[in-house]
Swiss-Prot record:
Subunit structure: Part of the Bam complex.
Assigned protein family: Belongs to the BamD family.
SUPFAM superfamilies named among the record's database cross-references: TPR-like (SSF48452)
CDD domains: BamD (cd15830)
Keywords noted in UniProt: Cell outer membrane, Lipoprotein, Membrane, Palmitate, Signal
Signal peptide limits: 1-26
The keyword Endoplasmic reticulum appears for this protein: no
A GO BP entry: Gram-negative-bacterium-type cell outer membrane assembly
Annotated protein name in UniProt: Outer membrane protein assembly factor BamD
Species for this entry: Xylella fastidiosa (strain 9a5c)
């Protein structure tokens, strides 16, 4: 019996071509995915470290994580964990960096890189959520929740207290000073809020708190001026004169002495929740905030 030849319709041919393409693509992806499988740990580390030196933070993070997954223990793994946290920090993934650092500190509490990791955690905490705010709204960072910056301050303090001779101690101290100024600015913001609303007692209380908690901050003389303003309106001439004398001695150019401080924004500007007030002492912008 003679069999008739089989003919493929265009539909059959297209289906076969698609199936072949999917098979080839899948094999290629699998080969690419497993390219690093079985690679010696030192080669994996060199690859990740090279990516990091080139500024390819995302690629470095992927490679470091692959090394850690394949080789959970050992000196290369420990170094990979440290550098992975740095790559996450440089990528702006500050929450991930803090998580990686915390995990390392719990696992290797006596590691020689612990001072560096506390320092890096301070940098990560001080930058949490700030990049987006700066780029989108240019918000005054002293207006936001201060829990992360406060944790950053504690991280830098740990470096200074526990590892005073480490190479990170000097910059940790500098970072602490900058954070203290930000905390002081937050208190100044609230003080200005109360002054503008003629809540003189509350304004004086907040200004005193600033001076007691953050002495020598960049906003100390603004706080003294706020005390002078509040006590003047409260009719306490003695305390108002004391504030005036402090300014005349230490900040004789402060505009409050000439009746030109504080300057409140125009009524239409008050409607803008992101409007700010300039510090007479520093020229910085003090954003207006509602107190808790």
């Amino acid at each position: 019996m003679i069999q008739r030849p089989t003919f493929f319709t265009p539909t059959h041919l297209l289906a076969m071509l698609l199936a072949t393409f999917v098979l080839i693509t899948g094999c290629h992806r699998e080969a690419k995915k497993n390219a690093d499988d079985g690679m010696p740990v030192e080669h994996l580390y060199d690859k990740a470290h090279t990516l990091m030196k080139k500024g390819n933070w995302a690629g470095a993070e992927v490679s470091f994580k692959r090394l850690i997954a394949q080789y959970p223990y050992g000196p290369y793994t420990e170094q990979a964990m440290v550098e992975n946290a740095y790559a996450q920090y440089k990528s702006g993934k500050h929450d991930d960096a803090v998580s990686s650092i915390d995990r390392f500190i719990r696992t290797y509490p006596t590691h020689h890189n612990i001072p560096y990791l506390y320092y890096l955690r301070g940098l990560s905490n001080s930058n949490r959520d700030t990049i987006f705010l700066r780029k989108v709204w240019s918000l005054d960072l002293s207006r936001r929740d201060l829990s992360a910056p406060q944790q950053a301050y504690n991280d830098f303090k740990t470096v200074l207290d526990r590892y005073p001779n480490s190479r990170y101690a000097a910059d940790a101290k500098k970072q602490m000073t900058e954070l203290r100024n930000m905390f002081a600015q937050y208190e100044m913001n609230v003080t200005l809020y109360y002054l503008r609303r003629t809540a003189w007692v509350a304004a004086a209380g907040r200004a005193n708190f600033l001076l007691e908690t953050y002495p020598q901050s960049a906003f100390q003389y603004d706080a003294v001026a706020a005390l002078g303003e509040a006590y003047t309106h409260l009719g306490n001439k003695t305390l108002a004169d004391n504030a005036r004398q402090v300014l005349q001695t230490n900040a004789p150019d402060h505009p409050w002495l000439k009746g030109k401080w504080p300057k409140y924004p125009a009524a239409i500007r008050k409607l803008n929740p992101f409007a700010g007030e300039k510090s007479a002492a520093t020229g910085q912008i003090n954003a207006v905030v509602d107190s808790n």
